[in-house]
Curated annotation (Swiss-Prot):
UniProt name for this protein: 3-hydroxyacyl-[acyl-carrier-protein] dehydratase FabZ
An individual GO BP term: fatty acid biosynthetic process
SUPFAM superfamilies, sorted: Thioesterase/thiol ester dehydrase-isomerase
Protein family (similarity comment): Belongs to the thioester dehydratase family. FabZ subfamily.
HAMAP family: FabZ (MF_00406)
Class of this enzyme: lyase
Keyword NAD: no
Molecular function GO terms recorded: (3R)-hydroxyacyl-[acyl-carrier-protein] dehydratase activity
Keyword list, A-Z: Cytoplasm, Lipid A biosynthesis, Lipid biosynthesis, Lipid metabolism, Lyase
Amino acid sequence: MKITESGFDIQGVLDLLPHRYPFLLIDRVIETNSKDSLHAIKNVTFNEPMFNGHFPAKPIFPGVLLLEAIAQACGLLGFKITESKKNANDLYLFAGIDNARFKRQVIPGDTVDFFVTFEKERRGIWKFTGRAEVDGDVACTAEIICARREV
């Protein structure tokens, strides 16, 4: 049985990620295992700016933003694994994506659960697997590659 730690609210997310509105895509971390996994959520509302154009008559949360949210969750997990805090010059940069698949649409009113798992790290390159779910149904899966760098 893995020992888990409690999650943290939006202030904890803001303390670790450099992203801000409208590009901060994680609302809360539900649970972390500081060794290898994290569960976060995003509440999707009709007031999100992307729905002005994607698509006005039938709003659908863009799949590429689901991938970005998974990457943000991976960054949060990276900071938790290393037990470090964000500083102005330290970022997890999106370095690559493999095997991205979209299974269902995400629409206003949905709560998206993001589950990310650390796979390996080599020479500053981190690999994670992630999935987005709505009501237990998989919306998106991907392998995310990040590089922690001082910028």
